[in-house]
Regions:
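Conserved class I S-adenosyl-L-methionine
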Residues: 9-18
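Conserved acidic residues
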Residues: 10, 31, 80, 118, ...
């Protein structure tokens, strides 16, 4: 389903690579994909899997998404779409769903992404208040509610950050 949200000419950066499943399927549709993951062992698994699957358009980066956006943006040259699926497990492997409890915290990441003026696709918990998300994160153009057999599994936010003013801030209090 997520493949429908990207085009063949897109250069996508998956900022939360994990084991690489989403990166793999997105890579089948786009010209190039940059996979970013801070866990080196996950990077190794993803690299091995991509090689076994014959994927040649993925670059694996063992890095932290926030640090990469701030300190090494040149590694993201040409990227026009950012994808992320923030980890929704907290201490003791407990499920979390609030943006600020996920890793990375999308509230922290959003201002950095706004500077890119790119498209952003974020996979989030279906427990989130959509109205609040629209107020919290500027530039959201679409919200996809993904369900399987009438069971809501996830929300997919699609944002066009080229429309967000440079002085836009996320420090407003949201009800």
């Amino acid at each position: 389903y997520k493949q429908r949200l990207v085009d063949g000419e897109d250069i996508v950066c998956d900022l939360t690579g994990g084991l690489g499943a989403d990166s793999y399927f997105l890579s089948l549709k786009v010209s190039r994909l940059i996979y970013v993951e801070r866990n080196a062992s996950y990077c190794d698994v993803a690299a091995y899997n991509m090689e076994q699957l014959g994927v040649r358009n993925i670059q694996i980066l063992d890095d932290n998404a926030v640090a990469l956006l701030i300190e090494r943006p040149e590694k993201l040259s040409g990227v026009n779409v950012f994808y992320m699926d923030p980890a929704r497990r907290g201490a003791g492997n407990r499920r979390v769903f609030a943006l600020e409890d996920c890793e990375p915290d999308l509230n922290e990441l959003w201002p950095l992404l706004c500077r890119s003026k790119c498209k952003v696709i974020a996979k989030l918990s279906p427990m989130l208040d959509i109205r609040r998300l629209l107020l919290q994160l500027p530039g959201i153009r679409e919200v996809h509610v993904v369900s399987v057999r009438n069971d809501c599994k996830e929300l997919l936010l699609v944002a066009d950050l080229s429309c967000v003013p440079d002085d836009s801030k996320n420090d407003d209090v949201v009800p």
